[in-house]
């Protein structure tokens, strides 16, 4: 039996991403070096310092003992990618961080943080747009797998199932938002994407 493609529903709005409902997961793109030093990543670091500590330790662990995998994408008409390549973890993966008590105690909502490792580096070391989109495709598949595992567990650990996101990859990584949005749509995800209010 043939399956028809599933397209997600992306709702775009203006406001503050950090006003997402309690229990929601906030998605953003990350480098693999353990740095949330600029842009929206710095805002995540300021709001969720305990989550940042987990992200940084995850990166440092993989930087200290290298682990690689070969990715063989299946090119399609609209794909920017198509060549197999060797990637060093955590590139092309997702890190799902549960709410940390220090981050929400007495002042913040309980948010899950989802890091999509879409660029190996940052600044001058940022990956090319084609590599970032390929890594986004891989990381979104990994994120979906981890979310499915959460849903299979009793109680979901406070995860509401709601996915919220910034226009990831489009800031300091310099990738056209429409390309990242298409990855989310093609993955069949429902995501609320929040951009800062103009003015």
From Swiss-Prot:
Query: Which terms does the record give in the GO molecular function aspect?
Result: phosphoprotein phosphatase activity
This entry's Enzyme Commission designation comes to 3.1.3.84
Indicate the segments forming the Macro domain, all copies: 1-199
Quote the catalytic activity from the record: ADP-alpha-D-ribose 1''-phosphate + H2O = ADP-D-ribose + phosphate
Q: Give me the residues that bind substrate, please.
A: 15-17, 29-31, 36-41, 168-174
**Which BP terms does GO give this entry?**
peptidyl-glutamate ADP-deribosylation
**SUPFAM superfamilies annotated for this entry?**
Macro domain-like
Q: Which PANTHER family match?
A: ADP-RIBOSE GLYCOHYDROLASE OARD1, PROTEIN C6ORF130
The protein, known as: ADP-ribose 1''-phosphate phosphatase
Q: Which organism is it from?
A: Aspergillus clavatus (strain ATCC 1007 / CBS 513.65 / DSM 816 / NCTC 3887 / NRRL 1 / QM 1276 / 107)
Q: Which gene encodes it?
A: poa1
């Amino acid at each position: 039996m043939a399956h028809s493609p599933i397209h997600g529903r992306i709702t775009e709005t203006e406001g503050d991403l950090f006003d997402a409902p309690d229990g929601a997961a906030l998605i953003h793109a990350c480098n693999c070096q353990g740095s949330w030093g600029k842009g929206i990543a710095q805002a995540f670091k300021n709001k969720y310092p305990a989550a940042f500590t987990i992200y940084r330790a995850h990166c440092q662990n993989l930087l200290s003992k290298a682990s690689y995998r070969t990715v063989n994408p299946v090119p399609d008409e609209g794909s920017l990618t198509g060549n197999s390549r060797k990637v060093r973890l955590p590139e092309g993966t997702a890190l799902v961080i549960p709410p940390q008590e220090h981050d929400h105690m007495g002042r913040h909502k309980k948010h899950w943080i989802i890091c999509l490792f879409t660029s190996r580096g940052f600044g001058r070391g940022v990956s090319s747009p084609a590599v970032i989109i390929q890594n986004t495709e891989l990381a979104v598949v990994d994120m979906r797998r981890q979310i499915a595992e959460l849903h299979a567990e009793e109680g979901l650990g406070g995860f509401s199932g709601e996915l919220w996101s910034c226009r990831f990859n489009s800031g300091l990584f310099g990738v056209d938002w429409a390309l990242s949005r298409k990855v989310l749509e093609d993955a069949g995800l429902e995501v609320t994407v929040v951009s800062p209010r103009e003015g």
